[in-house]
Regions:
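Active-site nucleophile and cofactor-binding loops and adjacent substrate-binding regions
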Residues: 47, 85, 178, 201-205
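Glycine-rich, aromatic-flanked loop segments that form ligand/cofactor-binding clefts
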Residues: 53-87
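Active-site phosphate/pyrophosphate- and oxyanion-stabilizing loops and adjacent acidic/basic residues
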Residues: 56, 68, 72, 134, ...
Length: 213
């Protein structure tokens, strides 16, 4: 898969790094970033791995965790959700209930059945998505948050329409309703849906996040 070309890029960048001072973390990042003429997830994945490794070297040399070098710890624990799934609506509900029983206060799931894109109109599979989200919300109750993961399956207009229909269930977030290629269109979805939008897992630089914000 994609790991092999990323390793090849790490090996390529390693030639520049040999013999250099590993403490010059930002300098090395900027040099490698600016000298990489063709960007993309492979190049940025390699650069990210190198950046993390340089921070790891510095932390080990100083005998401190990396968070101490970045301003210090801000919390002792974080809230987690459980991603749940199921082929049928009943399977999905049972999986969500099991997560709650295990102590999770939030569950994330994709509201579409595995065959949602086969022989169904958009209206049919959107109706099914609303039905599944409603069933999970009813099963877990008001004290548990639901997070709806769309996996970039819809166009902007479809994302807005489905998002508005899901507002009644008060999702904690609405994740990747559309492809992240256009920050402006994602902004339109966020503006027209009363649900927080979660996105960014396909971004590879801080500059993409800047455009989105």
């Amino acid at each position: 898969g994609w790991q092999r070309p990323t390793k090849t890029m790490v090996d390529t960048m390693a030639e520049y790094l040999k013999g250099k001072n590993p403490d010059y973390i930002e300098h090395h990042y900027q040099w490698l970033y600016r000298s990489s003429h063709f960007m993309g997830s492979v190049v940025q994945g390699a650069l990210s791995a190198i950046d993390i490794a340089l921070w790891d070297i510095k932390g080990k040399r100083l005998g401190v965790p990396i968070y101490d070098l970045m301003g210090g710890k801000t919390r002792d624990k974080v809230r987690c959700y459980m991603h749940v799934g199921g082929t049928t609506k009943d399977d999905l509900v049972a999986s969500a209930q099991a997560a709650v029983k295990d102590g999770f206060t939030a569950v994330r799931f994709t509201p579409f059945p595995p065959d949602y894109y086969l022989h169904k109109s958009y209206t049919e599979w959107a109706d099914e998505a609303v039905d599944r989200v409603g069933a999970v919300k009813e099963a877990v109750g008001g004290e548990v948050d639901i997070c709806v993961e769309i996996h970039r399956q819809m166009a902007p207009a479809e994302s807005i329409w489905l998002g508005r229909r899901l507002e009644q269930f008060n999702p904690f977030f609405y994740e990747d309703p559309m492809l992240p290629d256009s920050p402006a269109r994602m902004g339109d979805v966020a503006d027209q849906c009363n649900i927080p939008i979660a996105t960014g897992e396909r971004f590879t630089t801080i500059f993409e996040y800047e455009q989105l914000l």
